[in-house]
Design a protein with these regions (language model features):
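Residue at a conserved register position within TPR or TPR-like alpha-solenoid repeats
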Residues: 65, 108, 150-151, 186, ...
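Structural signature of alpha-solenoid helical repeat junctions
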Residues: 53, 94-96, 136-143, 174, ...
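Conserved structural position within tetratricopeptide repeats
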Residues: 83, 126, 167-170, 204-207, ...
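TPR alpha-solenoid repeat register
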Residues: 100, 178, 215, 249, ...
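Helix-turn-helix repeat elements of alpha-solenoid scaffolds
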Residues: 25-42, 67-86, 113-129, 154-162, ...
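Flexible helix-coil transition and linker loops at the boundaries of alpha-helical arrays
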Residues: 42-50, 84-95, 127-139, 204-208, ...
Length: 467
């Protein structure tokens, strides 16, 4: 009988829990590759990490710790969230705490501590009953909290985050926090079809809260894309002056300067952010990519070798920090491979190329990798056969792309050189036949060979930029 009563209590409790607005009912990790990737992105990649979102972050951390089975740590984060809410939203503490209390209830439920879970369900119920609802209320503050949570959780949550902020603004259209959330969500969704012009939401958010420096930076980045660079730079300068230590502002400003080609200013800002967040692998990644861009710049201009070596060392140091902490960064291993090849450290270059090949790559990324590795084999390793193999494999992926065209040209030049020495070279003729088939060229192979011979046989020298 006691067992039946316990089961009935559990089922009743679970029914109540499903009605709560909580991280446990929002499906935040739906579609994620791994919990590690999710946690890394939430804690390190996402911006707006400043003080006003500490309670939001604590609730997300509590949810992650629960998913890992670290229940004591989860409860610890929920206690921190409560404290931040009391401190930052004293006049709305009850409503702002509903999500946290819901998370408490879920954690205790999974621990089998049903009485404590019921205690938090009842706390939610008491507040909601003031609004004539048993376990959830339609509160703009709750919609806002869900919106911020979803924004922190990555790109696949941006659309739902935008809906949350729109819903909150319907009830309170002049609320600065709700307007900021909508502006940020609109900015992020602008890169995906259907395009959503974020300029008006961004300007409205600034009108409602002129002190929101992060939103100013986002508006500046959008204006830069619209070729309104002067206004964009003015907004960034103003934001940096008023919030010189805000890491989200600094990172956004660095992005703007990097786009304009002012790599030194971008690096200076990112290093400043790194002082506040020394272990943030995304900052190391961005700094490393800036140094890599400077390497390409100096190399193109024929700069001093010592300067080039210094820049390569900086690029390697930061990119290695990022790669060692998160091996899934897009192209970072191949960047490292090319940089090591530049300084003659071929074993390290080979290691990072193979590391990149071992990943699950998109067709575009795989084609770029075949191009880079083919260049490495051709120019550094002097292994023509391997280079040809990788250029052929790369061209097969997408011959119409920029990379595909480069590899077709390289294969043709290699065939030209062979034919200039021996017009019957079998490897050269095989290459030309492959290219002829690739281009669906119906001309005879011999005629095609004559045309290729006339086009010259020069292969340019290799460099990191030679892609």
């Amino acid at each position: 009988m006691d067992r039946e009563v316990c089961e009935t209590t559990k089922n009743s409790l679970e029914h109540s829990l499903q009605q709560l607005k909580s991280h446990f009912t929002w499906n935040l990790v739906e579609g994620e590759h791994s919990l590690d990737d999710f946690e890394d992105r939430v804690c390190n990649e996402s911006e707006f990490q400043n003080s006003e979102f500490k309670a939001t972050m604590c609730n997300i951390q509590a949810y992650i710790k629960h998913r890992r089975g670290q229940h004591d740590a989860a409860l610890g984060y929920l206690r921190q969230a409560e404290e931040f809410i009391r401190r930052e939203h004293a006049d709305q503490a009850e409503v702002r705490s509903l999500v946290t209390w819901g998370n408490y209830a879920w954690v205790y439920y999974h621990l089998g501590r049903f009485a404590e879970a019921q205690l938090y369900v009842d706390k939610v119920k008491q507040v909601c009953q003031k609004f004539s609802s048993p376990y959830r209320i339609e509160s703009p503050e709750l919609d806002c909290e869900e919106g911020w949570t979803r924004l922190k959780c990555g790109a696949n949550q941006n659309e739902r985050a935008k809906v949350c902020f729109e819903k909150a603004l319907q009830k309170n259209p002049k609320n600065p926090e709700f307007a900021s959330g909508l502006a940020i969500a609109s900015y992020r969704l602008d890169t995906k079809p259907p395009s959503q012009d974020p300029v008006n939401p961004l300007r409205q958010a600034i009108r409602l809260n002129p002190d929101n420096q992060y939103v100013k930076v986002l508006l500046a980045l959008k204006l830069q894309k619209m070729n309104k660079k002067d206004e964009g730079e003015r907004l960034v300068e103003e934001a940096l002056e008023k919030a010189p230590l805000a890491t989200d502002v600094i990172r956004g400003a660095a992005k703007l300067y990097r786009r304009t080609g002012d790599l030194d200013q971008a690096i200076e800002l990112l290093r400043k952010a790194l002082q506040c967040m020394p272990n943030n692998i995304y900052l190391h990644c961005h700094i490393g990519c800036c140094y890599r861009a400077k390497v390409l710049e100096v190399e193109k201009m024929g700069g001093e070798r010592e300067e080039l070596q210094r820049l390569i060392r900086h690029a390697i140091d930061h990119l290695k920090r990022a790669d060692e902490s998160n091996g899934n960064f897009f192209r970072i291993s191949s960047y490292l491979a090319c940089l090591y090849a530049q300084v003659g450290q071929y074993e390290e270059a080979e290691y990072y190329f193979q590391k990149e090949f071992s990943k699950e790559l998109s067709p575009v990324a795989k084609q770029v990798l075949h191009l880079r590795y083919g260049n490495f084999q051709l120019f550094q390793r002097k292994c023509e056969d391997k280079a040809i193999h990788h250029f052929i494999e790369g061209v097969k992926i997408n011959q119409g792309s920029k990379e595909g065209e480069k590899m077709r040209n390289k294969l043709q030049r290699l065939a030209n050189i062979k034919l200039s020495k021996n017009r019957a070279d079998p490897k050269a003729l095989h290459l030309l036949a492959f290219l002829q088939e690739l281009n669906e060229d119906m001309q005879p192979a011999a005629e095609y060979s004559e045309r290729c011979l006339d086009s010259g046989n020069h292969i340019p020298s290799a460099s990191l930029a030679e892609e």
